[in-house]
Structures are given as structure tokens and as C-alpha cells.
């Protein structure tokens, strides 16, 4: 079981490296790692388990955050209408995106970053993601709103990018042009 002790913190070199693709079919060890990742994200949202194991609530996790330099992500997040997007993916890739942007009005946080870093993080409003599930199914999904932001945040981790890299250093709360504000 993954706990907060397994999550590397900001400054760890794994967070700034480009993760390697997972050769498919994945090994049993890789499947177990990804299964553990989605279990962690789900557990972190369960108040009883989060308190018992001292988990910070999260909506996503990327393998580099547990010092595994492979292209694997787990996302468990709802959109504004309450639809659940729960995915554990090998080799996720954004294959297309909108010109229009979006951002969370509350800013973003990260399980690997202990302090709050204020500012707007511009993201694409809509994305299309391809990847392979734990069951070996190749998927092609279209995302918008909060789930699209979560996927972009996690896929950034696979490329050594942190959310605060996107924040305007001169004016952190400068509203991105042509962007939808998303409340969370």
C-alpha cells in the first residue's frame, strides 16, 4: 500500500526527469505498481482511510511521484456534474487539445509539494488522451473541465514538469487569455 512516506517531495530528481514508456504488455510488477497508485488515490479520498493512514487527499498520482520513472498515471476525479473519471493508465498521451484554455480559480496543488504555491495554472480547456488500461484496453477519451486539468497535471509529471512552472512569475494571478475559469 502506498502512503505519503512513499511520495517524493519537490526537489527530488525523479520529479524533473522524463519518464520512460512502459513496454506493453506490462510486467506483473508494473501492473501492481499502477494498481497500487489508483488504490492510493481512491484511499486518499476516503475520510476514514485518509485519517487512519495520514493520507493527503488527492485526485491523481504519477509514477515519478513514487520514484518510478515510468509513464504511468492514476486519476480519480469528478467533473462539475458529478461524473467520475477513474483511470489507471500506461503510456498516457495527449493527442489533441483545444486552443481555448482553462484554469482553476483556487490554483493547483500537488502531493509532492507540501506548501501552497499561489497562482493560476493555464491548461487546455479540452484534451483527447490515449493510453492503455490495467486490463490492457487501449482507450481514447475526450476530457474537459476539472478532469482535463487533472490529466494535464499528471501527464506533466511524466515530462518532468511541475504545476508551478506554468504560473506567471511576474503576475501569478494574471487571468490567462481566452480561458474558462473553473471553480473547485
From Swiss-Prot:
Pfam families xrefs: Pep_deformylase (PF01327)
Gene: defB
Role: Removes the formyl group from the N-terminal Met of newly synthesized proteins. Requires at least a dipeptide for an efficient rate of reaction. N-terminal L-methionine is a prerequisite for activity but the enzyme has broad specificity at other positions.
Enzyme class, first EC level, given as a word: hydrolase
Species whose genome carries this gene: Bacillus subtilis (strain 168)
Active-site residues, as the UniProt record annotates them: 154
Spans through the membrane: none
Binding site for Fe cation: 110, 153, 157
Protein name: Peptide deformylase 2
GO molecular function terms attached to this record: metal ion binding; peptide deformylase activity
HAMAP family: Pep_deformylase (MF_00163)
Cofactor note: Binds 1 Fe(2+) ion.
Gene3D superfamilies found in the cross-reference section: Peptide deformylase
Highest classification ranks of the organism: Bacteria, Bacillati, Bacillota, Bacilli, Bacillales
UniProtKB keywords: Hydrolase, Iron, Metal-binding, Protein biosynthesis
Amino acid at each position: 500500500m502506498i502512503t505519503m512516506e512513499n511520495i517524493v517531495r519537490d526537489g527530488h530528481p525523479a520529479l524533473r526527469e522524463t519518464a520512460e514508456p512502459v513496454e506493453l504488455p506490462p510486467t506483473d510488477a508494473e501492473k501492481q505498481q499502477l494498481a497500487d497508485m489508483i488504490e492510493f488515490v481512491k484511499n486518499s479520498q476516503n475520510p476514514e482511510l485518509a485519517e487512519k493512514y495520514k493520507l493527503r487527499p488527492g485526485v491523481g498520482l504519477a509514477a515519478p511521484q513514487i520514484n518510478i520513472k515510468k509513464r504511468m498515471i492514476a486519476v480519480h476525479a469528478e467533473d462539475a456534474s458529478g461524473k467520475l473519471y477513474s483511470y489507471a493508465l500506461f503510456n498516457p498521451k495527449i493527442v489533441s487539445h483545444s486552443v481555448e484554455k482553462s484554469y482553476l480559480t483556487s490554483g493547483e496543488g500537488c502531493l509532492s509539494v507540501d506548501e501552497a504555491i499561489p497562482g493560476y495554472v493555464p491548461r487546455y480547456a479540452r484534451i483527447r488522451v490515449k493510453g492503455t488500461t490495467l486490463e490492457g484496453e487501449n482507450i481514447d477519451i475526450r476530457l474537459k473541465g476539472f478532469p482535463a486539468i487533472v490529466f494535464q497535471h499528471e501527464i506533466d509529471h511524466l515530462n518532468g514538469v511541475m504545476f508551478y512552472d506554468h504560473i506567471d512569475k511576474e503576475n501569478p494571478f494574471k487571468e490567462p487569455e481566452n480561458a474558462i475559469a473553473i471553480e473547485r
